[in-house]
Amino acid sequence: MEGDTIRIGHLSTMYHTAFLLRGSALLAERNISATWALYPSGPDIIAAMQAGKLDLGYIGLPPVIIGIDRGLDLACIAGGHVEGTVIVAGSDTPTLAECGSMGEFLKQFAGKTLGTPPKGSIHDVILRELLREHKRADVAVKNYPWADFLSDAISTGEIAAAAGTPALAATAHRYGNGRLAVPPDRLWPFNPSYGIVVMREMLEKKGLLARFLSAHEAACEWIRHDPAACADIVARTTGMVDPAFVLETYRISPKYCAALPPEYIASTMKFVRTLHVLGYISRQVREDEIFDLAGIRSIHPGPHHYMAGICGT
């Protein structure tokens, strides 16, 4: 059997399948061993891949596009989740629904600062494009090295609101220091919140990647069909949150699947144009430079499940 160990970089994002694969037998059942390394952000994973430290990463697609533009030979070989960015604000801040339009919602932040994870992360790009689209040059953006810092920054008034993962909204709800101001489906339709990305030299290990993708697909389906059991495993694996917190995070944006359908790819290519306009990349990176579809089409040949939701929602 082909080389059995994969060096994997992942984030603290608990709805990624990384924690589920770490805490279950899904990889071992497929004769795969993995070394896991936690990173603060997608751009940090890209830097580690560039340094030769990783074979595979769990990453939002904008950092991948930026890495390819800089000469890194990467390929997105599977999806995982879409629409994983929310905006959270202080409890007294009017929400998008209360404001009635995105323009009115953003207007209230004139002269204030909004927070996001590091520059080049998917949350950073979505927020900056939103401000550009609505001509809000009077709103500043502050990037934080870890997404985990955003909740405290809202509490202290350092920032007025933040763009981040659904866990940010779950934290705000649990501790009462903020609330969900813009839900994930109102920001960027079908945005590729994360995919499975490898160095292209890994594509030669077809058997190993096929077994990994089989495990990843099984984990995505597990989240969809038994989120409570998955939440128990993830909570135990992280050792930092309880199952109820994980379950709430799952439900804020319940759009899980391993497939790479046309909608996922089209949304990614929209990011290419946005990244170019924002000056993050020097050229229009091509679709075939970003994606390698052969493996996941073999593992998941049918229709995608991103819009099918999860049990209990």
Task: Identify the role of each PLM range.
Residues 32, 72, 136, 240-241, ...:
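Helix N-cap/coil-helix junction residues
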